[in-house]
């Protein structure tokens, strides 16, 4: 089930731009799937998690590591924010992004701290996998 961004003033990824001008442009429209770098893809994937845009998450996951399906957020999950700790480009086609995503589930606060790996193939960035920190 797709949701609408909760705040028209700011994107779910934490940038001060409105969703359509930030991650929304990678989720649909002329720039669909065209995030220009790994950090932009990471932010757009976080927003897709917040908004339950499962098709986008699967399409931006590298085919070699992509699951066959994803489950939508449980009803008691509330995403609270994203912090990019580091973003490094190893070469033209490989990058890492370290992030902390905060969420609350069943009233309990949780942090997901991950170092994610990305690869660029045929002019598109893909999430490959990550190490939980």
Curated annotation (Swiss-Prot):
<protein>
    <recommendedName>
        <fullName>UPF0225 protein BP2036</fullName>
    </recommendedName>
</protein>
<comment type="similarity">
    <text>Belongs to the UPF0225 family.</text>
</comment>
<dbReference type="InterPro" id="IPR048469">
    <property type="entry name" value="YchJ-like_M"/>
</dbReference>
<dbReference type="InterPro" id="IPR023006">
    <property type="entry name" value="UPF0225"/>
</dbReference>
<dbReference type="Pfam" id="PF17775">
    <property type="entry name" value="YchJ_M-like"/>
</dbReference>
<dbReference type="InterPro" id="IPR032710">
    <property type="entry name" value="NTF2-like_dom_sf"/>
</dbReference>
